[in-house]
């Protein structure tokens, strides 16, 4: 049986931004076309369906119902949704969670807040929601006892990319999952795998560190265990390297967030016209980076190719401190995301 797997949708992200929700809609047209074309009746959601674990914007909830849950219900799809860290209200238990409280009107939505084995299309699957202080023992026991060869969940496993360029050092040891033939997980937003454990990545760009990193969802066949990525062709973030005389298709950047890296600007008037033309094309936001220090080109190349998180994390790794660097990295990432929500 062919199923669809999607994860880390983060409805209501960026302070329930209309700009981002309109961008998300472009992806969901592709998603639902695949659902209909392939007559898919089972959708598996691997967590973090909503963005804010502490509160929900009512308009974000209505948007999710109108554009996602109502459509799945009308298509006759059963949705298995795993509780992730963003949908669990408390950090030490999954008992209070957004998907259970907000989606009770949908009989087709099955919320998984504790480790549960479910057979889909003849395939036994162990579903593992966010592991915390309360459920860790029960989760480990469920993993030990199950005969399922496939596990799916919202997991934090060490040794995989949290985002492009940064491997997570904290998390559960991957050897805990060695009994499974395949493990499919949400949580990390970039795709990575070791041919047994697969982080599937989220459907769309949300932050600058998502730039030029493939996004989308997956089709999974429960009979032959084939996993097929369906990429999202739409982008939110663009980076332009500016030179005198550059020619661009301004329409490409409508309702997008653009970073202009100035590598040459001998004609100031021409540059001003370029920026004005970007705004005339209804660009959502323009960031300009200028650096003409030719004495240190390696540093400029490094900075222009990296995003804020990776630059700071590299600084942390190279610093001299007795503190646990992986924990400092994690704290900074949380602060960075909170800051992004405020702009």
Regions found by a protein language model. Give the residues of each.
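Core catalytic region of metal-dependent phosphoesterases/phosphodiesterases
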Residues: 2, 9, 13-117, 176-180
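Active-site-proximal beta-strand elements of phosphoester/diester hydrolases
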Residues: 2-13, 122-131, 150-154, 198-201
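Divalent metal-coordination and catalytic microenvironments
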Residues: 8, 43, 48, 64, ...
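Active-site environment of divalent metal-dependent phosphoester hydrolases
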Residues: 10-14, 51-54, 81-92, 118-119, ...
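Short, conserved loop/helix-junction motifs that constitute active-site signature segments
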Residues: 72-75, 142-146, 174-179, 251-253
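Conserved catalytic scaffold of divalent metal-dependent phosphoesterases
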Residues: 85-175
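Conserved beta-sheet core of the metallophosphoesterase superfamily
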Residues: 163-229
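Accessory, non-catalytic peripheral segments of nucleic-acid enzymes
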Residues: 222-343
């Amino acid at each position: 049986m062919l199923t669809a797997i999607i994860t880390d949708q983060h409805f209501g992200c960026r302070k329930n931004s209309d700009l981002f929700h309109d961008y998300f809609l472009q992806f969901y047209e592709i998603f639902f076309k695949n659902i209909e074309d392939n007559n898919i009746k089972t959708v598996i959601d691997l967590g973090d369906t909503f963005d804010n674990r502490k509160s929900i914007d009512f308009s974000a909830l209505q948007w999710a119902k109108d554009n996602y849950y109502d459509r799945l219900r009308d298509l006759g799809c059963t949705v298995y949704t795993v509780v992730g860290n963003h949908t669990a209200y408390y950090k030490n238990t999954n008992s209070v969670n957004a998907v259970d409280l907000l989606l009770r009107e949908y009989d087709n939505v099955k919320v998984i807040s504790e480790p549960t084995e479910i057979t889909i299309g003849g395939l036994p699957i162990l579903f593992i929601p966010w592991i915390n202080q309360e459920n860790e023992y029960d989760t480990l026991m469920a993993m030990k006892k199950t005969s399922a060869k496939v596990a799916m969940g919202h997991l934090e496993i060490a040794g995989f990319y949290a985002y492009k360029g940064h491997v997570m050092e904290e998390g559960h040891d991957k050897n805990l999952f060695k009994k499974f033939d395949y493990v499919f997980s949400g949580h990390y937003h970039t795709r990575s795998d070791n041919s047994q454990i697969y982080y599937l990545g989220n459907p769309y760009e949300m932050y600058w560190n998502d730039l030029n990193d493939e996004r989308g969802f997956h089709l999974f066949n429960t009979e032959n265990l084939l996993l097929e990525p369906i990429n999202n062709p739409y982008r939110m973030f663009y980076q332009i390297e500016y030179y005198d005389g550059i020619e661009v298709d301004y329409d490409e950047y409508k309702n997008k967030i653009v970073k202009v890296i100035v590598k040459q600007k001998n004609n100031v008037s021409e540059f001003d016209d370029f920026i004005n033309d970007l705004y005339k094309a209804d660009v959502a936001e323009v960031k300009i980076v200028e650096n003409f220090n030719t004495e240190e080109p390696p540093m400029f190349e490094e900075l222009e190719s990296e995003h804020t998180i990776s630059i700071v994390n590299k600084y942390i790794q190279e610093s001299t401190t007795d503190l646990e660097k992986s924990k400092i990295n994690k704290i900074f990432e949380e602060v960075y995301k909170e800051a992004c929500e405020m702009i």
